[in-house]
């Protein structure tokens, strides 16, 4: 087949065939029929992603490469930040973001074991897990309903002389009160990590400027797992405007190396063999000098290739998510006597990840969810509900050590008991949204 072709000609033919294959076997989806299962999330893609994936595979560059560089550059440009590091998951991104704040390079602002980090228990566990894994103490504050984000009025009662940071997620795409939280962090000289994994594309107006979430704090994180706003299968990102934090993030991501050379590169600094570090002998190969205890958290170039194609489509994804959320909220008008419908935080433009619903008194969440599921609509809890109630906290609860609660978690407990959510992903049609709203209204009868 390729006997008379150059390598480039063969490659172009393979990619053209890949495009045809995708258009024939992947993109001929059956239209939604009433009664079909409606998932809360799904990947949305076309031939562009598959062509990029095959293009990368043909190079057989199995680690990070040209697509990784392209993605990091274009993603940083989209966000309006200077530095972006691609990683293998959103959970790794959160781990890396927090881990960066434990670096001795931060001097008196370094987070040490026993230092406190303010967060919430109503969310996903990997926002909190790095805090515990590094020996710091999460301090849990309650959230507000129907925004499902931290109540900033409770921050002052949570702070202590041990507090070093605030680490919060923008719940299902709804930005938390960034002005209040950022002012609080500035007032107390605290780090702010924005877990932006469920909120890519959301905006918040601060000091008269509309900015993307994840870029207002010191470090932001994203996830590219298939249900998220865009995907590369597995994958995540850490981003910042701070050059020192970027240097630390790259070190921790790449085994803890002091060297900035990418795999396969050598001696970019020109001083590979002529400097002395720690108590190593003069001239020890800088490629193998370690300034941190790090990991290998990089993604592959094949994942990045998919991400590059997704990123070009991303604005349309956000537009559709906003449409779907607004359509669903309009369709559920008249249910407010039984359900609390979600509301955007003030000064925000959410890129919604899901549609959160809290049952009012007299409506049993579990029974309602079961009826909705029986009608083919997939539902989800607000992740952990109240993380403190989970088995991973059993030992800490028993000893009363390892975490602290500031005030009550009344709304957090209510979310655990009464809240669920349904999807608004960009592949949903208006017919699917109508069916979801009908299923909920019928289940309430």
Task: Indicate where each model-derived feature is located.
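Conserved active-site segment immediately N-terminal to the catalytic lysine
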Residues: 194-232, 247, 287-289
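Active-site PLP attachment segment
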Residues: 215-260, 301
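PLP-dependent aminotransferase class I/II
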Residues: 27, 69-73, 81-84, 153, ...
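N-terminal "arm"/small-domain region of PLP-dependent enzymes with the aminotransferase-like
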Residues: 1-62, 291
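PLP-dependent aminotransferase-like
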Residues: 21-25, 103-203
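Phosphate-binding glycine-rich loop
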Residues: 66-116, 129-134, 140, 207
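Glycine-/small-residue-rich active-site loops that bind phosphorylated ligands and cofactors
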Residues: 45, 63, 123, 146-147, ...
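Structural detector of well-ordered beta-strand residues that form the stable sheet scaffold
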Residues: 85, 118, 139, 192-193, ...
């Amino acid at each position: 087949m390729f006997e008379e072709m150059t390598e480039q000609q063969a490659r172009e033919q393979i990619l053209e065939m890949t495009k045809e294959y995708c258009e024939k076997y992947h993109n001929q989806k059956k239209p939604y029929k009433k009664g079909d299962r409606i998932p809360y999330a799904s990947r949305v893609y076309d031939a562009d992603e598959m062509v990029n994936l095959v293009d990368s595979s043909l190079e057989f560059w199995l680690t990070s490469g040209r697509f990784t560089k392209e993605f990091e550059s274009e993603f940083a440009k989209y966000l309006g930040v200077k530095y972006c590091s691609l990683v293998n998951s959103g959970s790794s991104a959160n781990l890396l973001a927090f881990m960066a704040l434990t670096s001795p390079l931060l001097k008196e602002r370094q987070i040490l074991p026993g230092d406190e980090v303010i967060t919430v228990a109503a969310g996903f566990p990997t926002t909190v897990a790095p805090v515990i894994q590094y020996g710091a103490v999460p301090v849990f504050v309650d959230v507000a309903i129907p925004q499902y984000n931290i109540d900033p009025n409770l921050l002052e009662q949570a702070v202590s002389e041990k507090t070093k940071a605030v680490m919060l997620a923008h719940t299902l795409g709804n930005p938390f009160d960034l002005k209040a939280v950022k002012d609080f962090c500035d007032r107390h000289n605290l780090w702010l990590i924005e877990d932006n994994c469920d909120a890519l594309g959301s905006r918040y107006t601060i000091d008269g400027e509309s900015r993307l979430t994840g870029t207002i704090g010191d470090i932001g994180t994203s996830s590219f797992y298939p249900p998220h706003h865009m995907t590369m299968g597995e994958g995540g990102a850490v981003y910042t405007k701070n050059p020192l934090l970027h240097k630390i993030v790259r070190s921790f991501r790449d085994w803890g190396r002091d060297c900035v050379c990418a795999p396969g590169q050598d001696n970019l600094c020109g001083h590979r063999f002529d400097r002395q570090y720690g108590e190593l002998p003069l001239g020890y190969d800088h490629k193998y000098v370690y300034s941190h205890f790090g990991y290998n958290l990089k993604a592959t170039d094949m994942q990045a290739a998919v991400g590059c194609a997704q990123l070009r489509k991303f604005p349309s994804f956000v537009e559709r998510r906003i449409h779907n959320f607004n359509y669903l909220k309009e369709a559920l008008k008249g249910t407010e006597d039984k359900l609390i419908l979600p509301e955007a935080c003030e000064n925000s433009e959410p890129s919604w990840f899901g549609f959160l619903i809290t049952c009012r008194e007299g409506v049993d969440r579990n029974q309602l969810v079961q009826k909705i599921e029986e009608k083919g609509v997939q539902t989800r809890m607000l992740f952990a509900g109240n993380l403190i109630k989970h088995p991973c906290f059993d030992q800490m609860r028993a000893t009363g050590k390892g975490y602290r609660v500031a005030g009550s978690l009344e709304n957090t407990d209510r979310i655990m008991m009464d809240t669920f959510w349904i999807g608004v992903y960009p592949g949903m049609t208006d017919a699917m949204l109508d069916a979801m709203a009908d299923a909920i209204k019928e289940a309430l009868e």
